[in-house]
Amino acid sequence: VQTCALPIWLPYEDIESFHRSFNDVYKMEPEQLQLGFLKVLKGSYMEEMKQKYGLLSQSKPPYEVLRTNWLSYEEVIRLKGVEEMVEVYYNSGQFRRTMKYLVQEWGDAFDLYDRLAAFYEEEGLNGVSHNRLARYEILYLFIQKWGNKEISYQDLLIYDLYLRENVKSRPSFAPDPSEWKNETKQFFMREAKERRYLKGYEAYDSRQMAKMAHLERMEDGSFVLFDYKNQIGRAS
Protein backbone atom coordinates (compact mmCIF):
# COMPACT_ATOMS: atom_id res chain seq x y z
CA VAL A 1 0.00 0.00 0.00
CA GLN A 2 1.41 3.39 -1.03
CA THR A 3 1.15 5.72 1.95
CA CYS A 4 2.00 9.42 2.05
CA ALA A 5 2.46 10.98 5.48
CA LEU A 6 1.80 14.68 5.87
CA PRO A 7 2.86 16.04 9.28
CA ILE A 8 0.64 18.68 10.83
CA TRP A 9 2.81 21.22 12.43
CA LEU A 10 6.23 21.98 11.20
CA PRO A 11 8.12 25.10 12.32
CA TYR A 12 6.89 28.23 10.49
CA GLU A 13 4.00 26.36 8.85
CA ASP A 14 0.62 28.08 9.02
CA ILE A 15 -2.72 26.80 7.81
CA GLU A 16 -2.28 28.30 4.34
CA SER A 17 1.06 26.58 3.74
CA PHE A 18 -0.41 23.30 5.03
CA HIS A 19 -3.37 23.83 2.69
CA ARG A 20 -0.97 24.00 -0.27
CA SER A 21 1.05 21.00 0.93
CA PHE A 22 -2.13 18.94 1.33
CA ASN A 23 -3.26 19.67 -2.22
CA ASP A 24 0.19 18.87 -3.63
CA VAL A 25 0.28 15.49 -1.89
CA TYR A 26 -3.37 14.73 -2.74
CA LYS A 27 -2.62 15.17 -6.45
CA MET A 28 -0.18 12.27 -6.17
CA GLU A 29 -3.20 10.02 -5.44
CA PRO A 30 -1.59 7.85 -2.76
CA GLU A 31 -3.57 4.83 -1.57
CA GLN A 32 -3.38 6.21 1.96
CA LEU A 33 -2.93 9.82 3.05
CA GLN A 34 -1.93 10.01 6.69
CA LEU A 35 -2.12 13.35 8.49
CA GLY A 36 0.13 13.26 11.52
CA PHE A 37 -0.11 15.65 14.45
CA LEU A 38 3.39 16.09 15.83
CA LYS A 39 3.99 15.28 19.47
CA VAL A 40 6.06 17.04 22.11
CA LEU A 41 7.60 14.18 24.06
CA LYS A 42 9.33 14.79 27.36
CA GLY A 43 13.08 15.22 26.95
CA SER A 44 12.80 15.62 23.17
CA TYR A 45 14.18 18.38 20.95
CA MET A 46 10.64 19.67 20.43
CA GLU A 47 10.23 20.12 24.18
CA GLU A 48 13.41 22.20 24.24
CA MET A 49 11.97 24.42 21.49
CA LYS A 50 8.53 24.89 23.08
CA GLN A 51 9.13 28.49 24.05
CA LYS A 52 10.76 29.50 20.77
CA TYR A 53 7.98 27.99 18.65
CA GLY A 54 5.15 28.89 21.02
CA LEU A 55 4.17 25.25 21.43
CA LEU A 56 1.26 24.24 23.60
CA SER A 57 0.76 20.48 23.77
CA GLN A 58 -1.31 17.96 25.65
CA SER A 59 -0.01 17.25 29.16
CA LYS A 60 -0.90 13.56 28.81
CA PRO A 61 -0.32 11.00 26.02
CA PRO A 62 -0.28 11.34 23.06
CA TYR A 63 1.23 14.82 23.81
CA GLU A 64 -0.01 16.27 20.51
CA VAL A 65 0.57 19.91 19.63
CA LEU A 66 -2.49 22.09 20.33
CA ARG A 67 -1.14 25.50 19.29
CA THR A 68 1.97 27.10 17.83
CA ASN A 69 3.16 30.58 16.88
CA TRP A 70 1.70 29.92 13.42
CA LEU A 71 -1.33 27.73 14.13
CA SER A 72 -4.08 28.74 16.54
CA TYR A 73 -5.94 26.23 18.68
CA GLU A 74 -9.04 26.75 16.51
CA GLU A 75 -7.03 25.96 13.38
CA VAL A 76 -5.61 22.79 14.95
CA ILE A 77 -9.16 21.64 15.77
CA ARG A 78 -10.15 22.47 12.20
CA LEU A 79 -7.29 20.30 10.89
CA LYS A 80 -8.44 17.50 13.19
CA GLY A 81 -11.75 17.59 11.35
CA VAL A 82 -9.98 17.40 7.99
CA GLU A 83 -7.97 14.41 9.25
CA GLU A 84 -11.19 12.60 10.23
CA MET A 85 -12.84 13.24 6.86
CA VAL A 86 -9.75 12.05 4.97
CA GLU A 87 -9.75 8.87 7.05
CA VAL A 88 -13.43 8.17 6.36
CA TYR A 89 -13.85 9.30 2.77
CA TYR A 90 -10.39 8.73 1.29
CA ASN A 91 -8.33 6.21 3.24
CA SER A 92 -11.25 3.78 3.61
CA GLY A 93 -11.24 3.35 -0.17
CA GLN A 94 -15.05 3.15 -0.11
CA PHE A 95 -15.80 6.43 -1.90
CA ARG A 96 -13.04 6.62 -4.52
CA ARG A 97 -15.14 7.49 -7.57
CA THR A 98 -17.49 9.84 -5.78
CA MET A 99 -14.65 11.74 -4.11
CA LYS A 100 -12.69 11.92 -7.36
CA TYR A 101 -15.57 13.72 -9.07
CA LEU A 102 -16.20 15.92 -6.03
CA VAL A 103 -12.56 17.04 -5.88
CA GLN A 104 -12.59 17.75 -9.63
CA GLU A 105 -15.75 19.81 -9.22
CA TRP A 106 -14.48 21.59 -6.11
CA GLY A 107 -11.07 22.31 -7.59
CA ASP A 108 -9.40 22.23 -4.17
CA ALA A 109 -9.08 18.97 -2.22
CA PHE A 110 -8.25 20.57 1.12
CA ASP A 111 -11.18 22.98 0.85
CA LEU A 112 -13.53 20.07 0.11
CA TYR A 113 -12.52 18.02 3.15
CA ASP A 114 -12.51 21.17 5.28
CA ARG A 115 -16.06 22.00 4.14
CA LEU A 116 -17.16 18.41 4.74
CA ALA A 117 -15.76 18.52 8.29
CA ALA A 118 -17.65 21.78 8.88
CA PHE A 119 -20.83 20.12 7.59
CA TYR A 120 -20.45 17.33 10.15
CA GLU A 121 -20.08 19.94 12.88
CA GLU A 122 -23.04 22.03 11.68
CA GLU A 123 -25.33 19.00 11.46
CA GLY A 124 -24.34 17.62 14.87
CA LEU A 125 -22.81 14.50 13.33
CA ASN A 126 -19.57 14.43 15.29
CA GLY A 127 -19.16 12.18 18.30
CA VAL A 128 -21.55 9.62 16.79
CA SER A 129 -20.61 6.11 15.65
CA HIS A 130 -21.77 6.00 12.02
CA ASN A 131 -22.02 2.72 10.13
CA ARG A 132 -20.92 2.42 6.52
CA LEU A 133 -24.37 3.09 5.06
CA ALA A 134 -24.77 6.21 7.20
CA ARG A 135 -21.54 7.62 5.76
CA TYR A 136 -23.09 7.34 2.28
CA GLU A 137 -26.28 9.01 3.46
CA ILE A 138 -24.30 11.88 5.02
CA LEU A 139 -22.16 12.39 1.94
CA TYR A 140 -25.30 12.44 -0.22
CA LEU A 141 -26.84 15.14 2.03
CA PHE A 142 -23.62 17.14 1.80
CA ILE A 143 -23.67 16.87 -2.01
CA GLN A 144 -27.33 17.91 -2.12
CA LYS A 145 -26.37 21.07 -0.27
CA TRP A 146 -23.03 21.88 -1.91
CA GLY A 147 -22.57 19.70 -5.01
CA ASN A 148 -23.22 20.19 -8.70
CA LYS A 149 -26.76 19.01 -9.46
CA GLU A 150 -25.79 18.27 -13.07
CA ILE A 151 -23.51 15.42 -11.99
CA SER A 152 -25.23 12.15 -11.04
CA TYR A 153 -23.67 11.70 -7.63
CA GLN A 154 -26.47 9.29 -6.78
CA ASP A 155 -25.10 6.90 -9.40
CA LEU A 156 -21.52 7.43 -8.24
CA LEU A 157 -22.39 6.72 -4.61
CA ILE A 158 -24.34 3.59 -5.50
CA TYR A 159 -21.49 2.44 -7.75
CA ASP A 160 -18.97 2.90 -4.92
CA LEU A 161 -21.30 1.11 -2.51
CA TYR A 162 -21.87 -1.98 -4.65
CA LEU A 163 -18.34 -2.17 -5.98
CA ARG A 164 -17.21 -3.20 -2.50
CA GLU A 165 -19.93 -5.72 -1.66
CA ASN A 166 -23.40 -6.91 -2.63
CA VAL A 167 -25.22 -5.04 0.11
CA LYS A 168 -28.74 -6.01 1.11
CA SER A 169 -29.66 -2.73 2.81
CA ARG A 170 -29.75 0.23 0.44
CA PRO A 171 -29.41 3.94 1.27
CA SER A 172 -32.59 6.01 1.25
CA PHE A 173 -31.57 7.89 -1.90
CA ALA A 174 -31.19 4.66 -3.93
CA PRO A 175 -34.10 3.66 -6.20
CA ASP A 176 -36.10 0.51 -5.47
CA PRO A 177 -34.51 -2.42 -7.40
CA SER A 178 -37.95 -3.95 -7.88
CA GLU A 179 -38.36 -1.31 -10.60
CA TRP A 180 -36.05 -3.38 -12.84
CA LYS A 181 -36.83 -6.79 -11.36
CA ASN A 182 -37.95 -8.20 -14.72
CA GLU A 183 -34.84 -6.92 -16.51
CA THR A 184 -32.68 -8.51 -13.81
CA LYS A 185 -34.42 -11.87 -14.13
CA GLN A 186 -34.18 -11.81 -17.93
CA PHE A 187 -30.53 -10.80 -17.84
CA PHE A 188 -29.45 -13.70 -15.63
CA MET A 189 -31.57 -16.20 -17.57
CA ARG A 190 -29.91 -15.01 -20.77
CA GLU A 191 -26.49 -15.07 -19.15
CA ALA A 192 -27.05 -18.69 -18.04
CA LYS A 193 -27.43 -19.59 -21.72
CA GLU A 194 -24.94 -17.28 -23.43
CA ARG A 195 -22.23 -16.96 -20.72
CA ARG A 196 -21.29 -13.56 -22.12
CA TYR A 197 -20.33 -11.43 -19.12
CA LEU A 198 -19.81 -13.54 -16.00
CA LYS A 199 -16.63 -15.55 -16.53
CA GLY A 200 -16.08 -18.46 -14.17
CA TYR A 201 -19.79 -18.90 -13.42
CA GLU A 202 -20.26 -21.89 -15.72
CA ALA A 203 -21.22 -24.18 -12.81
CA TYR A 204 -24.05 -21.88 -11.67
CA ASP A 205 -27.62 -21.44 -12.91
CA SER A 206 -29.44 -18.11 -13.31
CA ARG A 207 -30.79 -18.01 -9.75
CA GLN A 208 -27.38 -18.71 -8.24
CA MET A 209 -25.75 -16.08 -10.44
CA ALA A 210 -28.36 -13.51 -9.39
CA LYS A 211 -27.26 -14.03 -5.77
CA MET A 212 -23.56 -13.89 -6.61
CA ALA A 213 -23.71 -10.77 -8.80
CA HIS A 214 -25.75 -7.57 -8.82
CA LEU A 215 -27.40 -5.61 -11.65
CA GLU A 216 -27.98 -1.90 -10.99
CA ARG A 217 -29.87 0.54 -13.20
CA MET A 218 -28.37 3.99 -13.48
CA GLU A 219 -30.32 7.24 -13.82
CA ASP A 220 -29.82 7.31 -17.60
CA GLY A 221 -31.39 3.86 -17.97
CA SER A 222 -28.12 1.99 -18.53
CA PHE A 223 -27.16 -0.99 -16.38
CA VAL A 224 -24.01 -1.83 -14.44
CA LEU A 225 -23.16 -5.43 -13.59
CA PHE A 226 -21.20 -6.09 -10.40
CA ASP A 227 -19.29 -9.37 -10.59
CA TYR A 228 -18.23 -10.28 -7.04
CA LYS A 229 -16.49 -13.51 -7.97
CA ASN A 230 -14.01 -11.59 -10.10
CA GLN A 231 -14.34 -8.24 -8.28
CA ILE A 232 -15.49 -6.27 -11.32
CA GLY A 233 -18.10 -3.58 -11.89
CA ARG A 234 -18.90 -2.79 -15.53
CA ALA A 235 -21.60 -1.63 -17.91
CA SER A 236 -23.62 -4.52 -19.30
Feature roles, as predicted:
Residues 1-114:
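A structural motif corresponding to the C-terminal lobe/cap of the Radical SAM core domain
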Residues 2-4, 231-236:
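Residue-level detector of conserved catalytic or cofactor/ligand-binding positions
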Residues 84-234:
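Radical SAM enzyme core and accessory elements
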